[in-house]
Amino acid sequence: MDKQFSFQGQYDFKTVSTGLYDSWSSASFFKPQKNKVPFTAILPPPNLTGTLHIGHAFEVSITDQIMRFKRLRGYGVNWIPGFDHAGIATQTKYEKLARETNPEYFQAPRKQKVKMIMDWALTQGDTIQSQIKSLGASLNWNQVNFTLSKKASQIVNDSFIQLFEQGFIYQAETLVNWDTKLNTAISNIEVINKPVDQQLYYIAYKLANNPKKRLVVATTRPETIFVDVCLFVHPKDKHYHSFVKQKVVNPLTGALMPVFTDSYVDKKFGTGVLKCTPAHDFNDFALNEKYRLPFVSCIDHNGLLNEHAKQFTGLTVSAARQQVVEFLQTQKLLVKTMPLTSNVGFSERSDTVVEPLLSKQWFVDLPKLKKALAIKKYPELIPKRFNKQVTRWLSQLKPWCISRQLIWGHPIPVWTHKQSGALHVGSTAPTDKQNYTQSTDVLDTWFSSSLWPLICLDWHKNKHFVPTDLLVTGYDILFFWVLRMTFNSYFQTKQLPFKQVLIHGLVRDAQNRKMSKSLNNGINPMDLIRDYGADATRLFLTSNHTPGDDLIFNEQKLKSAANFLNKLWNVTKYVLQLGEQAKTVPSTHLPSTLSERWIWAKLKQLIVQTTKLLDKYQLALANQALVNFIWNDFCNTFIETIKQEDTALLPQLYTTAKTVLSTAVVMLSTVTPFLAERIYQQFHSGSVMQASWPTAKAVKPPKLFADVVEAVSSLRHYKANNQLVANQNLAVVLSGKAAPVVQNYFHFNWVDLRIEVNKTPGFQIKIVDNAANNLAHLEKQRSFYLAEVQRSQAITTNPAFLKKAPPHKVKAELLKLEEYQKKLAEVNHLIAKLTKAE
């Protein structure tokens, strides 16, 4: 019992949380106890590029609630943290800072550059770790990992070497996403598509044997015509049957090009004629592989046109486009131009237009690896609907480019013989290393990240790999991370890396937009913790989403979470004061009151309900049940009845109140650990983290008191929904056989109560005050809500609205309809129940 902490004054989350995290950590509460059934999870490693963002806070809050629940349930929880070196993201972030603070970096040798980035990155890790702790995350900080540590390097090298030796890693020249500013290949996830206003150029390709005839091609990229290899038309497009297998003249080079047919061609786009430029377009590259055509590039890795562009050599892509169009115009080969808005890929890190370019890179042959592994059962995905998406991805796997032209990352363990070109692949250099050149490329960050479970569980030391129990992660990296972890872990261990994957969505702004720098709509979770506290932030984040769905940020709901914690603080103060009052009353053994039996039954129902929900990771529903119990059942009902009970009952009522409160607080500690700890320590020695999850069998609350609760609620609704004269009380008749037993529960300062005992079972209430006027008021309300329900139903069943309106507007209208229907039902209930005897 913590006698030093006082519940005097108003709720102050800063005072509540001060010192608690350090005390938990010092007591080793976050370390797994070896004598318990293990439950292991790994934290998706945040990038060392800055500070914690709202998505991290969302994920950490979800996972920590589950980890705390499992601890209370008796598991030896080991939640393992760590950080991702985040190759391109970290290097570009540091180099941007270095331009202002450390210009010496750009003249430094490679090894020194890596050290400079490492020193900076590790300080970022300290900041992120501090921020995660401020959320109350119960991570095992004695086991922190890093994807660029010596341990990780050994595992990464071993994995690369084994995959290479077994034929799953190879080197090839092929088309990749190329960042011309950073001069490196990048992954699909690092390409951001943005709508761009462009011009669609209609260009004539003359028939070789009849220059008067021509095929017109619509393209946004006339600067790549130099390396066109052929034209395609759709086989069912009758307009072009006579052109098939003929040759046309390249309008910029004069080279002859064949005309082929392929059903890939979109007959409705442009003229229905497609120019094939396999060195600069992924779709064209796929066609090229199908038809085995020659291909060559006219754009170099710096984004400049090369020698194949003739007089346009050395120009940037944008400058070349303009000059090529002018040249075609002079040759009377430009038929027309039309405006077009279409998506263009930009590099997430440099904001440069991404160029599909030919480059010699290293690849993991994922289709071949998948076939060889023959995994029969993948980790269980929650929700199950993501299984379809994963199945589709598995059927469409392509080789994975794993090399990057950066300095920050795991060096590719490959040396090339200077004369023969023979490769040496190993964790150490060849004995005659003077005859070899070491690769200057590094591995894609996702390659080391795909080995994260092995890194976290020290697989290089202990080959007995124990799969983790749960991974909590976002749907946006399900393919890029989760599937690749599954492949790499299974390749090394013949076991899945995790048993279950709980999938969450993104955090979107109040307008349902994805957060981005361009929109400047990002939310800093540290600001939320500063303004509302970690408990309120966690409660909001975990209570307003369902697995797999996005969370729409709503500050009003965050304020509601803070209001609940204030209510919890105040009721704790009241219970503590009740304890002081109870000391002045002689202790006697009296039967439990009706309200006590009711609150015990409600508590048992809550225990059963929340246990089932948290076992299924239905955090939002569990939290809503907890909040509803504490706010309505405990505070608004049970505590209010205490004020009306005989003072002789105070000792037992206090015992019931503190026991129910502290039991509920144990469950609540999973989501609001700071305030829960302070409350728990008022009634118990030790920490709430040493408590056990309560167990119970569900029982039905006493019907008589349940009827009382419903009747009181109806009276309150009636009072709130009717325009009563100032200082006028409700005249209420309480009748029935049980009227004397329950009358205390109706003694409010706004009720004039008259008791009429009769032989009718139970009790009945009847309002006799100004019934006609109040009924008229209720009828008016009913008409209003009925009209709104009908209006909203008309909108939400209108096919045009459902087809054209944005999803968030449809959802908002459906929520409106639900609220109006609820209000209408309440008014109907009052009209039916409160104007006549039950």
UniProtKB/Swiss-Prot annotation:
GO terms for molecular function: aminoacyl-tRNA deacylase activity; ATP binding; valine-tRNA ligase activity. It catalyses: tRNA(Val) + L-valine + ATP = L-valyl-tRNA(Val) + AMP + diphosphate. Its main location: cytoplasm. Residues 768-838 form a coiled coil. One of its GO terms (cellular component) is cytosol. CDD domains: Anticodon_Ia_Val (cd07962), ValRS_core (cd00817). A motif ('HIGH' region) lies at residues 46-56. One of its GO terms (biological process) is valyl-tRNA aminoacylation. Keywords: Aminoacyl-tRNA synthetase, ATP-binding, Coiled coil, Cytoplasm, Ligase, Nucleotide-binding, Protein biosynthesis. It holds the Pfam family Anticodon_1. Its EC number is 6.1.1.9. Monomer. This is Valine--tRNA ligase. The gene is valS.
